[in-house]
Amino acid sequence: MGTPDFAVASLRRLVEDGHEVVGVFTQPDKPKNRGMKLTFSPVKEYALTQDLPVYQPLKMRDGEALGILRELAPELIVVAAYGKILPQEILDLPQYGCINVHSSLLPKYRGAAPINWAILNGERITGVSIMYMVAALDAGDVIRTVSTEIGEREDAAALTLRLSELGAQALSETIPTLADGTAKRTPQDESAFTYAPMLDRSLSPIDWTRSAREIDCQVRGLIPWPCAATSVDGKSVKVYDTLSGEMTADAPGTMHAVKRGLSVACGDSRSLIITQLQAEGGKRMAAADYLRGHPLKTNG
């Protein structure tokens, strides 16, 4: 059970390891882009290439989904970023239970956007957890964790790709221990849990009075959506990448065109250089190229 790119790696590993995948559950097709054409989830796209049966129930709490699962009679249910809550009747169904590939070191960052929030909060270390699923959100006993450093310039999209592969490997190593009864169960420390809520556009506006590192984390943590954003000469632009600039005495938000892009003063007397941006209605491009076509008129 999974939906986005993160889940594809785990499904692919199940297939490569020779497990019989009796069914793939993913979110319903959704309209996308200007044409509002129905688009398959990445998991569905991969499943169809492997001739795997795909199911897309609107709800998991109705009799239809439970009926399908009872007919499939899975020994194990693997969940990776499915996006739907499983009722207790489904959690109790498989012989070996339901396990989840979660992209954080639990109990930190339970919730929908753990990768983004780890970067937004300036974490240096993150990882993946394989856990037993319970009715409470991401609160089940942990079977296995794998930690990794977050790269200094790694954004959420790149980290998602890397953690998806780490999660798939951890899943591959976990399943045999479920079958032979050697899987460990480590209860989570409820006093140490943190929450990673869904992202929304309210997180986008850059407050240049914050430190350069905090803003850099905001930029990297909001890739590919909703993206950090700022105003350049009154025009809204999405910010995709930055570099550390020089110390500055300018007021926060003061902007200067420089060779590598657009230098902006931050609240800690440091500057960040915006190197990649996207103007409203335009394409992502180098900030230096944008400034050649739209010379900076004002500072701040």
Report each predicted region and the residues it spans:
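N-terminal Rossmann-like dinucleotide-binding module
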Residues: M1-G35
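Donor/substrate-binding cores of folate-linked one-carbon enzymes
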Residues: D17, Q27, L76-Y195
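N-terminal glycine-/serine-/threonine-rich beta1-alpha1-beta2 phosphate-ribose binding loop
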Residues: P31-A73
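An anion-binding loop in the catalytic cleft
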Residues: T209-G300
